[in-house]
């Protein structure tokens, strides 16, 4: 808890108030400076300026002199006034040491260690050695921004250079050619011995004298008068600092390569450089920088290279600063999470108050005296700008500045104008020209660099934005001063002597030169400064009148200026100390601190008893502490123990948190405010969770090692064995489908006895045993189907066509030609694989077996190479041993011809044996038999008939007599060669190519005598021995082809579906950016056991959505008070802490109906609401925490009913809102919070965005989803792409990346073509609440809610539908009841979610997904209306998906089989299967190649490697674990027989009367609340378009005055009608909160938006004198918290909001009513038309563009038109132009 006493109040004294009596002269000031120099003390020139004197000697030995009081004063103003501060560390002499680090050390809070490390790493880039300063900074300005919580602690920090950059001219490119000067220290550190030998060799480093940039002065060593002067030691420290800010590894290599490249490139800057050396240097430098040498040599001149060196060096420094800021942010995150202390050592306890409203203090070091002088003199003496101008305008009497001072000030500013961002004069134009030239050169170099080079990343830090050097990551120094409370800390130097001389002096304060010091005082006009400030302008705080009274009313200050003046006199303050201006109160430091001290010592209870708290009025939304209710819309309750009151009310809340004491709570203490409303629900549970933070119990508040779960994360409870004993027995009818299924299950599992399951399987309950039987049957059927599929694909074809894998035709044998590893040959109709034989030396002659001899034979038909002797092959035909056939084909390899018998060449060879062929060859070759050589029947017939190929078939065998007949032709039919029976030969001659079996058999059977018969038989035997060629190809038969054609048909179908999915995924063109939408959206986030990091990311992403903040509502529903694994407290407490709700808030627990069995339908919940701020976006939120009944509080998960119940809670609420039906007490409280507190009627919300708590939504996603729905009124549900946030975390996440991508871009894109996405994921889906045309409820319809809220989930099918796949089932129900609507997927809307990182979690997730998918697809198959017809319908696609999910294991088995076939070569290559697989993955690869998602190439490879996991392990595990549920004990199904289901009920049941229902109108009337709505029948004129009839709703968007937290919200695209009323029309809120000090000027820093003056910044208010500007039109919502300030002075280019104040008193301002019909949608059509006509009359139509016209029209209307308004404006512009 923050201390109420201030650090400042105890550590310092405030200055005396009032003008000082004596004038300050140069002499008196000089004397004072000498005194403080001797005593090492600071001197206060005025309340915001301190002077100190320092030398390097005093800084090194005694420590630098700095003013800690000034630091404390700046800190107090920042946190108390909620205003940004800026401390300028100015130097009046070139020899003063840097005070940046010493000054940071004086702040009264701890500075993170990473800031000092970052500065240590950065300083060598900015510091140089000069003769007058051993460490002279060369930057224009360096700022350290400290972001503080309003408790005063650091919550963030960053470093930045000013836009003026670095003086590289004097620090690098052109250092003075005098002894004592060096370039930036970093180059000497690079060249020291600290660099490793490997680095020196790689970089080619030499001594400093070898580099032209360093050699100009001849000075290479640091000054010797410094006792710590050692570049080597400094380099070691520097390298360590770099490592600690994250510059290590490849980043460090790139960094030193760039530095070395710059050094070497400096040697090319001389115009007379040697050409050979020049080319060598350019080659070397280009290698270091990653670019082509031609860029340096040919495309850049010498002057261009000079510019490149300076620009690239600045870009490198910017990169180092960005790395430093990342390291600081990482440490701040660890500090916030409690993982580290602020000094970087150890851990600490995280505090819950550091994530809220913030302010910033920026400490800016301006080392150059001329620049500091110009800044200071302009701030003090220029009365036309800044705070001086505001004071004068408000009536502060200021004496004019002397003309000489003005001229001197103007000359000082003119001398350094470009460094101050003033580009109007000659110097400015020259600077602008140089910057533009630098940008062109750097852009040329960047484009000439390699795509992944470090230089390109330096020059293009943000992809697609080009060179941003000097802008990105820099701050605008004048703009910073104009938007902050400025403090000056000026450092003088006592002498002009060189630093070396100081070391010889007797004392460290001996050096003194009055002339030197006097020159510094007079140069900066410090005497005039002191006199002017102390006489007129020394006011350090200013207030609005109401703001002043609100803050100090507790001290007796009365209303109005008269009351302030009276109180001022009572305090004894003169008009000079507190000045009452026209509109503001100006206070000097002394009186301000006196008043603040009185507030500090004032008891908190006395402040409360006065009816107000100064910490809740005027400043309560900025830095002060809110009362326990935290809202400011309810009266502060008395400090009563029953309300967990505390006397210390300074717990800082965050983000406008509506800690929201609800109406119920207030009603319990109506004596606090008689106008507060009574309870919503008379049945509010009084005794539930009344202790602990947020009223949610003590769990998580004190950690005592409570154990709620076992190791498996399951609740440790005991089941009652006597299931039906003492229980109520119910029975209900069973539908026919269920009865049939039960009968089928028992028919298949009757053989499994129930006692076995009960005692061995430990399934004591009948419903659990029945679920197991159902699971067993389903698993059996799935395995059976998978087995049938595998058998059909692999085995059925072989069964129909045996030996199909043993048949090869000539072409297939020829594929093994020249193949060493698969040596196939065909010999006499047989195919042999002689791979293991051919390399053996199998010849017994001189012929050697070599590759040259053997490989040409591979793949050949070798019949003629192995011809047996005819006299042996054709016995009985009288053939001589000298007779042989003459082959029709030429023998190409004679060495391979195996001629045996008579014609053997080598008589010693085994071939000389006439029986070699049968005795040797055939037995050996049979060992390598592989199959039959086959011939297509058509080929045999065609060649026989058309080509006279003398072959024919005998049955299935092919015989060829070509060689025999050719031998006869060659030998003129010589008798000795005519050995075959001529009648038999005539069969071949007369019928070639035909089947001669019948004729041949008949010829042999009808032989005339035995001699002829013997001759015929011998001839036939001879033909079989010498003419056999193989068999006919049986694989072409119908029996063998039917299975292939069936498989091919299904393959074609699958390919067509895949191809259509592919075409559906092809969406070319750029990513269109839709115009901003203006529909109201609820962002629902169901929360269960998520951790703080994921919850914060999810909420931050929703808050940062690029969507009108007022039109989105974050609705967080916490499913029970549950402590998640890894958390130290319940999830609801984590959520409320993130949102910034005060832990003291304890709203009542209100009853509502939950989705549960029996008595679990009664549940209680608590409601919290407020505003959450992130990165300048302030969004309303509502949190519903389900806390459970009183009887549940002792259980581990009180209130937990599941995600489906969380969805139903909100859907049911919106359903009742739509129908204006009676609501439960919880729903009434939700309505009250949304309608009256947040200020938006719930019926205005048109869309429901469902986001999981571990999902981060991209910024433009919501606008894209809404735009898609706005353009297509038929869309009822829409989802975007879900990508992985942790894709590279573990192996298990890696295998999911590709699957996520393809599942969206193939499956969902295909289904979206039909408008029938079957699964809208619950992690990122948006539903339309009601139809556009008739306002018909959709997602909130009665039918959907009824089916989705089934309470009795007691069967396996229901469990898988409603407990595992609720999101998919919700989509199924929407498709069922609204088939005419569309359900779309748009890839442009994206989100990121965290995938399971471990095997166990992945297994659990996929079990749920796969089983729910199957059961949901079964439901989808039963729907009657699915688009399409027959096989072209979505029903067919759903069937394909269902089959695909079921047969996943068989798919894996088949792919394994294919791999086996290919690896072993044991069968023909399945080309079709391989082509299909290639097509599927090829098309998928083509998708991400066309979408330029190159990274998915790698992810696809990983996915394919993990395919067995996805297709085999996960499905089988899922199928077997379909019954793996937690079964409730309340309702137990003890039997399903006949047509009845018997249920045992073990509790008191649910009585609907326990939840009282009440219509909102009745409740509002009874409690005097605004917002009467009327009944549903009164909605006849209701329109969901732009014409709302909602005056009676009294929302902030309706005509009536209704207060809400949105009144002060900054919004985008908000129409601000001129002269609209102040908040609440100047009247008190109807909620009974009478004090409204925030009506006019209110500090809004907690929004982080720069909204400071509600008269100019309220979304609905504007006043005369407020002129629109581009920055106004752009809005303030995207400014970071650091850019806003409580008192921003004037608009700047950075977009700081204007602080101009209207001179009109409040009474003169118009008090008109805000018209909702036009206010929420901007101006009407007529106003737009008039504005267009006016603009077109004023502009030059020949040069103006339509975009410019649109901008001018919007500027004239003071709003940005969106949606339909923008479309109307575009049409009207075209129309007006046509008519001109």
From Swiss-Prot:
Native organism: Fusarium oxysporum f. sp. lycopersici (strain 4287 / CBS 123668 / FGSC 9935 / NRRL 34936)
Region spans: Disordered: 1649-1691
Residues annotated as domain DEK-C: 1722-1778
Keywords: Cell membrane, Glycoprotein, Glycosyltransferase, Membrane, Motor protein, Myosin, Transferase, Transmembrane, Transmembrane helix
Gene: chsVb
Main localization (coarse): membrane
Protein name in UniProt: Chitin synthase Vb
Family matches, as SMART domains: MYSc (SM00242)
KO phenotype (gene knockout): Impairs the ability to infect and colonize tomato plants or to grow invasively on tomato fruit tissue. Leads to hypersensitivity to compounds that interfere with fungal cell wall assembly, produces lemon-like shaped conidia, and shows swollen balloon-like structures in hyphal subapical regions, thickened walls, aberrant septa, and intrahyphal hyphae.
GO BP annotations listed: chitin biosynthetic process; fungal-type cell wall organization
Every Cytochrome b5 heme-binding domain range: 805-866
Family classification: Belongs to the chitin synthase family. Class VII subfamily.
Catalytic activity field: [(1->4)-N-acetyl-beta-D-glucosaminyl](n) + UDP-N-acetyl-alpha-D-glucosamine = [(1->4)-N-acetyl-beta-D-glucosaminyl](n+1) + UDP + H(+)
Topology class, membrane: Multi-pass membrane protein
Alphabetical list of InterPro entries matching this protein: Chitin_synth, Cyt_B5-like_heme/steroid-bd, Cyt_B5-like_heme/steroid_sf, DEK_C, Kinesin_motor_dom_sf, Myosin_head_motor_dom-like, Nucleotide-diphossugar_trans, P-loop_NTPase
Lineage: Eukaryota, Fungi, Dikarya, Ascomycota, Pezizomycotina
Biological function: Polymerizes chitin, a structural polymer of the cell wall and septum, by transferring the sugar moiety of UDP-GlcNAc to the non-reducing end of the growing chitin polymer. ChsV and chsVb do perform additive, but not redundant, functions in septum formation. Functions not only in the maintenance of cell wall integrity under different osmotic conditions but also in polarized cell wall synthesis. Plays an important role in the complex infection process of this fungus.
This protein's GO CC annotations: cell septum; myosin complex; plasma membrane
Glycan attachment positions: 133, 153, 629, 644, 655, 660, 888, 1009, 1411, 1524
């Amino acid at each position: 808890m923050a201390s109420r006493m201030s650090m400042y109040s105890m550590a310092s004294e405030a200055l005396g108030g009032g003008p000082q009596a004596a004038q300050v002269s140069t002499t008196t000031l000089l004397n004072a400076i000498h005194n403080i120099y001797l005593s090492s003390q600071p001197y206060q020139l005025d309340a915001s300026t301190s002077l100190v004197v320092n030398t390097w000697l005093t800084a090194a030995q005694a420590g630098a002199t700095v003013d800690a009081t000034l630091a404390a004063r700046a800190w107090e103003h920042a946190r108390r006034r909620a205003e940004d501060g800026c401390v300028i560390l100015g130097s009046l002499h070139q020899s003063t040491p840097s005070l940046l680090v010493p000054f940071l050390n004086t702040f009264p809070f701890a500075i993170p260690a990473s800031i000092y490390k970052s500065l240590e790493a950065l300083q060598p880039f900015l510091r140089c050695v000069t003769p007058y300063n051993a460490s002279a900074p060369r930057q224009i300005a360096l700022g350290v921004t400290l972001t503080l919580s309003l408790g005063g602690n650091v919550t963030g920090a960053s470093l930045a250079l000013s836009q003026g950059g670095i003086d590289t001219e004097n620090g690098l490119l052109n250092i003075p050619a005098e002894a004592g000067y060096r370039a930036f220290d970093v180059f000497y550190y690079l060249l020291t011995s600290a660099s490793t030998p490997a680095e020196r060799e790689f970089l080619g480093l030499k001594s400093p004298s070898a580099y032209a940039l360093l050699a100009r002065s001849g000075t290479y060593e640091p000054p010797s008068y410094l006792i710590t002067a050692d570049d080597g030691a400094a380099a070691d420290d520097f390298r360590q600092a770099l490592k600690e800010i994250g510059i290590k590894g490849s980043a460090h290599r790139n960094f030193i390569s760039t530095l070395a490249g710059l050094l070497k490139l400096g040697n090319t800057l001389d115009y007379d450089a040697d050409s050979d050396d020049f080319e060598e240097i350019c080659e070397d430098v280009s290698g270091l920088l990653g670019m082509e040498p031609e860029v340096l040599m040919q495309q850049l001149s010498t002057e261009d290279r000079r510019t490149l060196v300076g620009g690239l060096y600045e870009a490198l420094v910017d990169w180092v600063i960005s790395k430093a800021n990342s390291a600081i942010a990482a440490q701040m995150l660890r500090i916030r999470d409690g993982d580290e202390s602020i000094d970087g050592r150890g851990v600490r306890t995280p505090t819950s108050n550091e994530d809220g409203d913030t302010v910033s203090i920026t400490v800016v070091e301006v080392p150059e005296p001329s620049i500091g002088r110009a800044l200071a003199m302009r701030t003090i003496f220029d009365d036309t700008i800044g705070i001086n101008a505001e004071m004068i305008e408000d009536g502060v009497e200021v004496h004019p500045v002397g003309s000489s001072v003005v001229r001197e000030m103007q000359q000082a500013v003119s001398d350094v104008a470009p460094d101050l961002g003033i580009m109007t004069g000659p110097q400015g134009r020259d600077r602008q020209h140089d910057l533009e030239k630098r940008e062109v050169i750097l852009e040329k170099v960047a484009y000439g660099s390699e795509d992944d080079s470090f230089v390109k990343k330096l020059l293009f830090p943000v992809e697609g934005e080009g060179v941003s050097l000097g802008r990105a990551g820099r701050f605008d120094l004048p703009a910073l001063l104009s938007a902050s409370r400025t403090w000056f800390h000026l450092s003088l130097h006592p002498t002009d002597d060189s630093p070396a001389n100081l070391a010889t002096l007797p004392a460290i304060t001996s050096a003194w030169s009055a002339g030197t010091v006097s020159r510094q005082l007079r140069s900066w006009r410090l005497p005039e400064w002191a006199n002017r400030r102390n006489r007129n302008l020394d006011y350090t705080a200013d207030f609005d009148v109401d703001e002043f009274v609100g803050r100090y009313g507790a001290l007796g200050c009365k209303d109005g200026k008269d009351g302030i003046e009276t109180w001022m006199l009572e305090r004894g303050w003169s008009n000079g100390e507190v000045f009452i201006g026209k509109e503001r109160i100006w206070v000097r430091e002394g009186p301000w601190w006196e008043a603040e001290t009185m507030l500090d010592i004032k008891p908190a209870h006395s402040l409360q008893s006065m009816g107000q708290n100064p910490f809740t009025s005027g400043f309560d939304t900025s830095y002060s502490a809110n009362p326990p209710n935290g809202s400011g819309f309810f009266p502060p309750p008395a400090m009563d123990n029953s309300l967990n009151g505390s006397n210390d009310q300074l717990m800082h809340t965050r983000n406008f948190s509506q800690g929201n004491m609800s109406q119920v709570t207030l009603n319990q203490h109506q004596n606090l405010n008689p106008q507060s409303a009574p309870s919503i629900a008379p049945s509010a549970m009084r005794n539930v969770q009344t202790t602990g933070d947020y009223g949610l119990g003590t769990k998580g508040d004190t950690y005592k090692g409570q154990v709620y779960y076992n190791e498996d994360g399951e609740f440790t409870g005991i089941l009652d064995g006597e299931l039906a004993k003492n229980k109520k027995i119910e029975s209900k009818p069973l539908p026919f489908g269920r009865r049939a299924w039960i009968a089928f299950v028992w028919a298949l599992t009757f053989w499994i006895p129930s006692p076995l399951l009960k005692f061995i399987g430990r399934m004591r309950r009948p419903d659990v045993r029945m679920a197991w039987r159902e699971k067993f049957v389903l698993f059996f059927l799935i395995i059976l189907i998978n087995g049938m599929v595998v058998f059909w694909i692999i085995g059925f074809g072989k069964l129909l066509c045996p030996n199909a894998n043993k048949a090869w035709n000539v072409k297939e044998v020829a594929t093994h030609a020249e193949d060493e590893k698969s040596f196939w040959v065909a010999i006499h109709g047989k195919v042999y694989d002689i791979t293991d034989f051919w390399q053996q030396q199998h010849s017994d002659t001189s012929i050697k077996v070599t590759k040259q001899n053997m490989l040409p034979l591979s793949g050949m038909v070798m019949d003629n190479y192995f011809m047996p002797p005819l006299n042996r092959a054709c016995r009985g035909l009288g053939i001589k041993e000298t007779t042989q056939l003459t082959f029709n084909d030429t023998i190409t390899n004679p060495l391979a011809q195996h001629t045996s018998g008579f014609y053997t060449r080598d008589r010693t060879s085994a071939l000389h044996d006439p029986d070699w062929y049968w005795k040797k060859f055939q037995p050996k070759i049979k060992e390598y038999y592989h199959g039959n050589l086959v011939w297509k029947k058509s080929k045999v017939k065609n060649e026989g008939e058309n080509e006279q190929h003398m072959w024919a078939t005998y049955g299935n065998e092919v015989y060829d007599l070509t060689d025999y007949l050719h031998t006869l032709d060659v030998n003129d039919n010589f008798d000795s060669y005519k050995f075959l029976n001529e009648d038999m030969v005539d069969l071949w001659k007369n019928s070639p190519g035909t089947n001669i079996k019948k004729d041949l058999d008949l010829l042999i059977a009808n032989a005339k005598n035995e001699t002829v018969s013997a001759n015929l038989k011998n001839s036939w035997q001879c033909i079989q021995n010498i003419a056999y060629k193989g068999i006919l190809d049986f694989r072409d038969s119908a029996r063998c082809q039917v299975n292939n054609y069936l498989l091919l048909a299904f393959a074609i179908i699958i390919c067509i579906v895949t191809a259509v999915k592919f075409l559906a995924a092809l969406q070319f063109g750029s990513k269109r950016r839709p115009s901003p939408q203006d529909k109201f959206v609820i962002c629902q986030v169901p929360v269960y056991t998520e951790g703080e990091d994921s919850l914060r990311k999810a909420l931050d992403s929703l808050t940062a959505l690029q969507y009108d903040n007022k039109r989105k509502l974050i609705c967080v529903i916490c499913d029970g008070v549950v402590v998640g694994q890894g958390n130290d407290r319940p999830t609801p407490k984590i959520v409320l802490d993130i949102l910034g709700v005060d832990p003291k808030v304890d709203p009542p627990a209100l009853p509502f109906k939950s989705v549960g069995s029996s008595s679990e339908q009664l549940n209680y919940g608590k409601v919290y609401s407020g505003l959450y701020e992130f990165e300048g976006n302030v969004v309303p939120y509502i949190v519903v925490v389900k806390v459970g009944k009183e009887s549940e509080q002792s259980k581990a998960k009180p209130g937990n009913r599941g995600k489906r119940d969380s969805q139903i809670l909100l859907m049911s609420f919106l359903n009742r809102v739509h129908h204006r039906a009676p609501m439960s007490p919880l729903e009434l409280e939700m309505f009250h919070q949304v309608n009256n507190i947040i200020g938006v009627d719930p019926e205005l919300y048109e869309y429901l965005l469902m986001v999981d708590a571990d999902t981060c939504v991209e910024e433009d996603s919501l606008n894209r989803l809404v735009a898609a729905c706005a353009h297509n009124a038929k869309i009822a549900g829409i989802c975007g792409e879900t990508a992985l946030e942790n894709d590279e975390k573990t192996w298990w996440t890696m295998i999911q990346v590709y699957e996520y991508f393809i599942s969206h871009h193939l499956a969902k894109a295909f289904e979206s073509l039909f408008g029938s996405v079957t699964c809208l994921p619950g992690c990122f889906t948006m539903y339309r609440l009601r139809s556009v045309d008739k306002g018909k409820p959709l997602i909130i319809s009665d039918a959907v809610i009824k089916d989705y809220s089934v309470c009795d989930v007691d069967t396996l099918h229901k469990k898988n539908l409603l407990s595992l796949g609720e999101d998919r089932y919700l989509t199924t129900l929407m498709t069922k009841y609204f088939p005419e609507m569309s359900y779309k997927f748009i890839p442009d809307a994206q989100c990121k979610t965290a995938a399971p990182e471990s095997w166990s979690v992945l297994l659990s997730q996929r079990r749920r997904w796969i089983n729910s998918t199957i059961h949901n697809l079964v439901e989808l198959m039963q729907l009657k209306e699915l688009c399409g017809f027959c096989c072209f319908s979505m029903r067919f696609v759903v069937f394909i998906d269902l089959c695909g999910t079921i047969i996943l294991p068989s798919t894996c088995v088949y792919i394994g089989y294919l791999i086996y076939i290919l690896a072993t070569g044991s069968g023909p290559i399945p080309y079709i299967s391989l082509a299909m697989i290639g097509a599927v993955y090829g098309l998928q690869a083509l998708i991400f190649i066309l979408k330029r998602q190159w990274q998915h190439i790698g992810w696809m490879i990983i996915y394919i490697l993990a395919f067995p996991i996805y297709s085999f392990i996960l499905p089988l595990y899922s199928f077997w674990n379909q019954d793996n549920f937690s079964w409730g004990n309340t309702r137990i199904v003890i039997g399903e027989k006949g047509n009845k289901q018997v249920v045992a009920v073990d509790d008191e049941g649910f009585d609907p009367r326990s939840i009282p229902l009440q219509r909102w109108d009745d409740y509002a009337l009874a409690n005097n609340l605004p917002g009467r709505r009327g009944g549903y029948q009164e909605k006849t004129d209701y329109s969901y378009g732009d014409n709302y009839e909602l005056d009676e709703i009294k929302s902030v968007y309706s005509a009536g005055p209704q207060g809400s937290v949105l009144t002060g919200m900054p919004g985008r695209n908000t129409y601000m009608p001129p002269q609209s009323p102040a908040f609440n029309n100047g009247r008190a809120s109807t909620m009974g909160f009478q004090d409204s000090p925030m009506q006019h000027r209110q500090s809004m820093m907690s929004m982080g938006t720069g909204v400071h003056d509600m008269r100019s910044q309220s979304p609905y208010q504007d006043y005369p004198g407020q002129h629109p500007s581009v920055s106004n039109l752009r809005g303030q919502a995207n400014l970071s918290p650091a850019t806003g300030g409580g008192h921003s002075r004037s608009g700047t280019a950075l977009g700081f909001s204007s602080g101009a104040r209207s001179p009109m008193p409040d009474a003169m301002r118009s008090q008109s009513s805000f018209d909702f019909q036009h206010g929420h949608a901007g101006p009407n059509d007529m106003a737009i038309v008039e504005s267009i006509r006016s603009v077109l009359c004023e502009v030059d139509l020949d040069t103006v563009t339509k975009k410019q016209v649109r901008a001018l029209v919007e500027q004239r209307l003071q709003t940005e038109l969106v949606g339909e308004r923008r479309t109307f404006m575009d049409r009207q512009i075209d129309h007006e132009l046509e008519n001109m």
